Amino acid sequence: MGRSLKKGPYCSPKLLARIEEMNEKDQKRVVKTWSRRSTIFPQMIGHTIAVYDGRKHVPVYVTEEMVGHKLGEFAPTRTYRGHGHHTERSTALK
């Protein structure tokens, strides 16, 4: 279930303030955030935001197509390494 339309999209006030400040000063530096739930706003286009995935901060460069999505969508929390493979030892046991 998504967020109610009457409430509008959510973005962390601290993150939004940092982005606005960087836009005013015309700066481009990486902004670290733990707020995966924040919606990407048009003001964020062109900035790199380091989103925490539970282990490290993943740099996400914001493009126009990302507006309206959540930051967490672009920093996966789980890495799938595949199922176990057959080895010489495991096939010899049969």
Swiss-Prot record:
One of its GO terms (cellular component) is cytoplasm. It comes from the Bacteria. InterPro entries: Ribosomal_uS19 (IPR002222), Ribosomal_uS19_bac-type (IPR005732), Ribosomal_uS19_CS (IPR020934), Ribosomal_uS19_SF (IPR023575). Signal peptide: none annotated. One of its GO terms (biological process) is ribosomal small subunit assembly. GO terms for molecular function: rRNA binding; structural constituent of ribosome. SUPFAM superfamilies: Ribosomal protein S19 (SSF54570). Keywords: Ribonucleoprotein, Ribosomal protein, RNA-binding, rRNA-binding. Belongs to the universal ribosomal protein uS19 family. Protein S19 forms a complex with S13 that binds strongly to the 16S ribosomal RNA. NCBIfam families: rpsS_bact. This is Small ribosomal subunit protein uS19. It comes from Desulforudis audaxviator (strain MP104C).
